[in-house]
Amino acid sequence: MSAIRPAAVVVLAAGEGTRMKSATPKVLHDICGRSLVGHVLAAARELEPENLVVVVGHAREQVTAHLAEIDPAVRTAVQAEQNGTGHAVRMGLEELGGVVDGTVVVVCGDTPLLSGETLRQLAATHTADGNAVTVLTAEVPDATGYGRIVRDGASGAVTAIVEHKDASESQRAVREINSGVFAFDGRLLADALGKVRTDNSQGEEYLTDVLGILREAGHRVGASVAADHREIAGINNRVQLAEARRILNDRLLTRAMLAGVTVVDPATTWIDVTVTFGQDAIVHPGTQLQGTTQLGEGAEVGPNSRLKDTRVGAGARIDNTVAERADVGAQASVGPFAYLRPGTRLGAKAKVGTYVETKNASIGEGTKVPHLSYVGDATIGEYSNIGAASVFVNYDGQDKHHTTVGSHCRTGSDNMFVAPVTVGDGAYTAAGSVITKDVPPGSLAVARGQQRNIEGWVARKRPGSAAAKAAEVASRKPEGED
């Protein structure tokens, strides 16, 4: 184990979070595609700890199930009653056998902006300074309401954490505050937790009392200052949740732009932590990129588009579109106002145009579905053209069925393809056709009734109407006169 690699990280995630006013446990609320506790776990994993323990309590079945999904290797400890942060850490250590040799880092499960880099700095400072405990602190513009860090003027060691209500005027002038994140000597921590008292207004075991116990025993208490005070912000309500989402989104967009991505309007662009970009990708205003979405080199998305778990190939263009679990080939064109549902796969240079919806459809290279169509449960070959207002009728009321259209086909406007049906390579279909039988390669399919004109119908059925009058005037015009 390296000098700064902790023996354990303990994440405190047992609180109810009543100020969120939500049926969802606080630590499971999402920002930028990851739960609050998920962000904390990701930062903690950067330390490569020997053990990672999450202390759960409120809604523990739901939280534990989520943890198993996002990080199966994590261990959980139960704090059945909310008896304070010191008690929660004690439950975490009991999961590890009670005493841990090495450094134990304690973090809060509702601090999604905390970075792995800051935690590494904390662990490194703790080891280098030989501290019994190291407090992660931050200097904030306004420290009102926070516990102040009081240091020894000569050594810089932390002598006390004074709560705002108990602070003197000189102490209230201090802008360095306690984050609630600590690095401890594991053996000293276990011993000190056994000495924490509950004779306070809340009747709880406070983790901060450990600092005083260790200092009074002659051990050094130090501090590591976070470079960005916003990293230590905890989430207690929806306002703070929104602010954290904005900060993290700005961080993600800045990273993308510095890597060669053009974001036209960062204020209206939202991305998840798992989104990736190729160089020279362009993102237009009003765009949301979610989940594992990938934009290839030179791909262009937006404005007003939402993509989730979607791959966009190099040079592809997506405009005013919603796409989920879709795969868009290189130099393909989508939109405006298209909807790519799960299972959509577009080949290179394919086109899905205005007001087109696709689902579980494979559309080949160079094929075009330009207008007002639904393509579901279908395979279309290369360089075919699907006429406007076409519908792939895939559902018979009980089961879904598949339609296959070959390569180099031309289908007329207002076609219905009633699955299961196959249109062979190079075949054409006439406008207005309802295709219910297979069309052989190279054939023209015409599946519509003959047109029948009933002369004088309007005059008989709608006498005196505007249509009847217009028809009467037209009938009096000499042939050939406009």
UniProtKB/Swiss-Prot annotation:
GO-annotated biological processes: cell morphogenesis; cell wall organization; lipid A biosynthetic process; peptidoglycan biosynthetic process; regulation of cell shape; UDP-N-acetylglucosamine biosynthetic process
Q: Which cell locations does it reside in?
A: Cytoplasm
Q: Which UniProt keywords apply?
A: Acyltransferase, Cell shape, Cell wall biogenesis/degradation, Cytoplasm, Magnesium, Metal-binding, Multifunctional enzyme, Nucleotidyltransferase, Peptidoglycan synthesis, Repeat, Transferase
Q: Which residues form the active site?
A: 371
Q: Which InterPro entries match?
A: Bifunctional_GlmU (IPR005882), GlmU-like (IPR050065), GlmU_C_LbH (IPR038009), MobA-like_NTP_Trfase (IPR025877), Nucleotide-diphossugar_trans (IPR029044), Trimer_LpxA-like_sf (IPR011004)
Q: Where does UDP-N-acetyl-alpha-D-glucosamine bind?
A: 12-15, 26, 79, 84-85, 147, 163, 178, 236, 341, 359, 374, 385
Q: What reaction is this protein's catalytic activity? A: alpha-D-glucosamine 1-phosphate + acetyl-CoA = N-acetyl-alpha-D-glucosamine 1-phosphate + CoA + H(+); N-acetyl-alpha-D-glucosamine 1-phosphate + UTP + H(+) = UDP-N-acetyl-alpha-D-glucosamine + diphosphate
Where is acetyl-CoA annotated to bind?
388, 394-395, 413, 431, 448
Q: Does the keyword Secreted apply?
A: no
Signal peptide stretch: none
Question: What positions does the entry give for Mg(2+) binding?
Answer: 110, 236
Please list where the region (N-acetyltransferase) is annotated. Answer: 260-482
A Gene Ontology MF term for this entry? magnesium ion binding
Using the UniProt annotation, give all residue ranges assigned to the region (Pyrophosphorylase): 1-238
What pathway does the annotation place this protein in? Answer: Nucleotide-sugar biosynthesis; UDP-N-acetyl-alpha-D-glucosamine biosynthesis; N-acetyl-alpha-D-glucosamine 1-phosphate from alpha-D-glucosamine 6-phosphate (route II): step 2/2; Nucleotide-sugar biosynthesis; UDP-N-acetyl-alpha-D-glucosamine biosynthesis; UDP-N-acetyl-alpha-D-glucosamine from N-acetyl-alpha-D-glucosamine 1-phosphate: step 1/1; Bacterial outer membrane biogenesis; LPS lipid A biosynthesis
Q: Where is this region: Linker?
A: 239-259
- EC number(s) on file: 2.7.7.23, 2.3.1.157
Does the keyword Ribosomal protein feature in the UniProt annotation?
A: no
According to its UniProt record, which protein family does this protein belong to?
Answer: In the N-terminal section; belongs to the N-acetylglucosamine-1-phosphate uridyltransferase family.
Q: How does it assemble?
A: Homotrimer.
Task: Return the protein name.
Answer: Bifunctional protein GlmU
The gene it comes from is: glmU
